[in-house]
Amino acid sequence: MAEHLASIFGTEKDRVNCPFYFKIGACRHGDRCSRLHNRPTISPTLLLSNMYQRPDMITPGVDPQGQPLDPSKIQDHFEDFYEDIFEELNKFGEVESLNVCDNLADHMIGNVYVLFKEEDHAAAALQALQGRFYSGRPIIADFSPVTDFREATCRQYEENSCNRGGYCNFMHVKQISRELRRKLFGRYRRSYRRGSRSRSRSISPRRKREHSRERERGDVRDRDRHGNGKRSSDRSERHDRDGGGRRRHGSPKRSRSPRNVREGSEERRARIEQWNRERDEGV
């Protein structure tokens, strides 16, 4: 029974826990949902609810005055917001991903999901965001159960084939330019490469301990094989002193004799006849 409940946890078959809150961290029913919303007490992911206010909030592609908006200006507005939020959250620790929803439903519009590398960094950011405002609006932040965005995002939206539009219950992640992504997240790759080079130049204390243990194990194996507790370096010095030979107990080096040539049948018969004559003469 326990295995069955664990296998259906967070799925449509689970009649106790809300699958949408488990996968997306948001549910269109909110607190009125008939299923449980298990809010995590600690998580590497924070949800900043309805934080991004797009310039075409009322009608996509049109400003509040009813004038059409240039798509490039909408993208610039979004990337300015994205960079601003990233730089602020990056103060608390390494940010692995930052996703902003492009959905239009009330429970998902403008939602910002930030996944930190460490849970402690997320907790520090959550503490610092309490009571703060952005663009004149209070920041509503909380831990989110979402840690794998592959299960939360709409695959049809990524393929430009979602027929639910902005009211889809899965995340429509708004994309940033490649240049901005390289600028923001590339710093971690550069710092990692620098750290790798510095680590390659010097051996860490842990590696030193492992190296010394390996050398000790090698010495024990040498003593077991050769006795006298001699190390391989001592044997190599003796090997060089003796001229590289393999002499043992002072015995001279033997030279191999050439192989005996097998006798023919006529030679054997002649030798046997000679033995018989010598035997008869002796008698």
Curated annotation (Swiss-Prot):
Composition skew (Basic and acidic residues), residue ranges: 211-245, 260-283
Stretches with biased composition (Basic residues): 191-210, 246-259
Pfam families: RRM_1, zf-CCCH
GO molecular function (one): DNA binding
Protein origin, superkingdom: Eukaryota
Compartments (UniProt record): Nucleus speckle
InterPro entries documented for this protein: Nucleotide-bd_a/b_plait_sf, RBD_domain_sf, RRM_dom, RRM_dom_euk, U2AF_small, Znf_CCCH
Zinc finger (C3H1-type): 12-40, 148-175
GO cellular component, one term: spliceosomal complex
Domain RRM: start-end pairs: 44-146
Record flagged with keyword Metal-binding: yes
Region (Disordered): 191-283
Subunit structure: Component of the spliceosome. Homo- and heterodimer. Interacts with RNU1, U2AF35A and SR45.
Family: Belongs to the splicing factor SR family.
Protein name as catalogued: Splicing factor U2af small subunit B
Protein source organism: Arabidopsis thaliana (Mouse-ear cress)
Gene: U2AF35B
